[in-house]
From Swiss-Prot:
GO CC annotation terms, alphabetical: cytosol; small ribosomal subunit
One Gene Ontology molecular-function label: structural constituent of ribosome
KW Ribosomal protein (keyword) present: yes
Protein name, entry field: Small ribosomal subunit protein uS13
Protein's organism: Maridesulfovibrio salexigens (strain ATCC 14822 / DSM 2638 / NCIMB 8403 / VKM B-1763) (Desulfovibrio salexigens)
Function: Located at the top of the head of the 30S subunit, it contacts several helices of the 16S rRNA. In the 70S ribosome it contacts the 23S rRNA (bridge B1a) and protein L5 of the 50S subunit (bridge B1b), connecting the 2 subunits; these bridges are implicated in subunit movement. Contacts the tRNAs in the A and P-sites.
GO biological process: translation
Keyword RNA-binding on entry: yes
Basic residues: bias regions: 107-123
Start and end residues of each stretch annotated as Disordered: 95-123
Family named by the database record: Belongs to the universal ribosomal protein uS13 family.
PANTHER family in UniProt: 30S RIBOSOMAL PROTEIN S13/40S RIBOSOMAL PROTEIN S18, SMALL RIBOSOMAL SUBUNIT PROTEIN US13M
Length: 123
């Protein structure tokens, strides 16, 4: 089992699919990495030699932000938006949709479960 960027890649998958288990690497990036390194993307993870694993690992470390570094940068970017007080930062702070979606009736994923409003009884 190959371990790259702190992630155990699945044994019986094609290499381009296995690399997508790393946070920050999708299909396009995986194919680009394999093309740069010169490894066939149809290879299974089991068939990789130690040298090939090391070349993929080196390519990822040198040219891509993945896993912890990427997560840390994304959190820092959101924190910066909230600190400068821009509109997007306010939406993040309030837990509302950030990209202009309507929030009058929908947006339940972002807002969470409905909070019921208690009606006042008439005397």
């Amino acid at each position: 089992m190959a371990r790259i960027a702190g992630v155990d890649l699945p044994k019986n998958k094609r290499l381009d699919i296995a690399l997508t288990y790393i946070y920050g690497v999708g299909r396009t990036t995986a194919l680009k990495i394999l093309d740069t390194v010169g490894i066939d993307w149809t290879l299974k993870t089991d068939d990789l030699s130690g040298e090939q694993v090391n070349t993929i690992r080196k390519e990822l470390e040198d040219n891509y932000k993945v896993e912890g570094d990427l997560r840390r940068d994304q959190i820092a970017d959101i924190k910066r938006l909230m600190d400068i007080g821009c509109y997007r930062g306010l939406r993040h702070r309030r837990g509302l949709p950030v990209r202009g979606q309507s929030s009058k009736t929908n947006a339940r994923t972002r807002k969470g479960p409905r909070r019921s409003v208690m009606s006042r009884k008439k005397k």
